[in-house]
Amino acid sequence: MAKLVTIFGGSGFIGRYIARRMAKQGWRVRVAVRRPNEVLFVKTYGVVGQVEPILCNIRDDASVEEALNGADAAVNCVGI
């Protein structure tokens, strides 16, 4: 099974590049964002089901923990 990465801020300028690149390398990509319905375009970065946006509030520990659940790696592209 492909490894899973969670990318925080994966819909931003740098995050988009990283999400695309990791999908091309065969990773399953979870893009953690504030408004997943506004970034559905990230699904086009891979095959069906490979890249998924999820809701995450980085100021809430439980939300971050849920976003990281099962991930093999994490990338932070969020500026606070």
Locations of regions flagged by a protein language model:
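Secondary-structure boundary/capping motif
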Residues: 2-4, 33, 71
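SDR active-site strand-loop-helix element
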Residues: 8, 32, 77-78
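Conserved glycine-rich Rossmann-like NAD(P)H-binding loop of the short-chain dehydrogenase/reductase
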Residues: 27-37
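N-terminal Rossmann NAD(P)H-binding glycine-rich loop of SDR-like oxidoreductase domains
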Residues: 3-27
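NAD(P)H-binding glycine-rich loop region in Rossmannoid oxidoreductase-like domains
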Residues: 36-80
